[in-house]
Amino acid sequence: ENQLKEGLCYVQVTRGVAERDFNFAKKSLLPSIVIFTQEKQILNNAASKVGIKIITVPDDRWRRRDIKTTQLLAQSLAKTHAVQEGVDDSLLVQGGFINEGSSSNVFIFKDERIITPSLSNDILGGITRSSVIKFCQINNIEIKEQKINIDDLMNAQEVFLTSATGFVLPVIEVNGRRVGNGLVGDIVKKIQLIY
């Protein structure tokens, strides 16, 4: 027993043990499973109450970003760059459009509706993202899946990120510019309460 009171459990499944080879056709392989836990304050995370600051960075990942893999170098570099710049996280940008956060999905509130990028090869469809979309629909909060450009992001009234370990995390500053009034907005608070 690990005595974990609050935190996360990470499960990773591999193709199994074999000689180094890119051939996945070997049917005799048995998948390997790695599970570990990590203590982390999730439910009473201070950032969820006061918000975080983020920057935008180029999205340098491979083309199939919708596949969850252990190849997280670009995301790690993006997060590290953000911390070195004195902020909490980064959003990954390609061709002027926001894809997602280094380990999260992104939502904005603009023109009386919530917007999040559509599922595509450019983003990993998160469990929390999916739940937030459903909760918005059930609670008659207008939500639209479409591309978000830099101008949309910078002119949004509210911005928030979602992830399995961060739930609904408000963003109060993007690229040194205050989001809305610089405080956690009413829409984000409502989504947090619903979630």
What feature does the model see in each segment?
Residues 1, 14, 19-195:
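Helix-start/capping segments and mature chain N-termini
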Residues 4-12:
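Ordered, amphipathic secondary-structure segments that act as subunit-interaction surfaces
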